[in-house]
Curated annotation (Swiss-Prot):
It comes from Ixodes scapularis (Black-legged tick). Keywords: Glycoprotein, Secreted, Signal. Glycans are attached at N22, N92, N104. Belongs to the salp15 family. The keyword Secreted applies. This is Salivary protein 15. Salivary tick protein that downregulates host immune system by binding to both dendritic cells, and CD4(+) T cells. Specifically binds to the CD4 coreceptor on T cells. This interaction prevents the activation of the Src kinase, Lck, and its downstream substrate Zap-70, and results in deficient activation of PLCgamma1, the repression of calcium fluxes triggered by T-cell antigen receptor (TCR) ligation, and a subsequent reduction in interleukin-2 production. (Microbial infection) Protects Borrelia garinii (strains A87S and VSBP) from host complement-mediated killing. Residues 48-67 are annotated as: Required for Borrelia OspC-binding. Glycosylated. InterPro entries: Salp15 (IPR021971).
Amino acid sequence: MESFVAMKVVCILFLVGVVAANESGPTKADASTADKDTKKNNVQLRFPNYISNHQKLALKLLKICKDSKSSHNSLSSRSSDVINDKYVDFKNCTFLCKHGNDVNVTLNLPEDTPCGPNGQTCAEKNKCVGHIPGC
């Protein structure tokens, strides 16, 4: 009889754990969803080969994007911030930051961002060669 009660307790604890895990998972409103999604291995970023850590750069750009929102007083703090690897211009050292559905802002890449296969960085934009797809 005691083992039956113990088994019920184990089952109840297991179910509580499963429900708690499902309810505590990230939602679309979670501000860090983009960070978590970017860290997943199944996200394929299309940055040039001379970018050594694609995910690190994407997270850095997302932070710059989020930080830039504070300079736009009219933006709602609840709007989502998004970057898209298709709109990172390594030749001109800029990227597109999207705040919510309506506001697109072009921002500068950090000066230490590689912008060419021979060690060029955005500190000297005139030496940047950008990205040639397929190379």
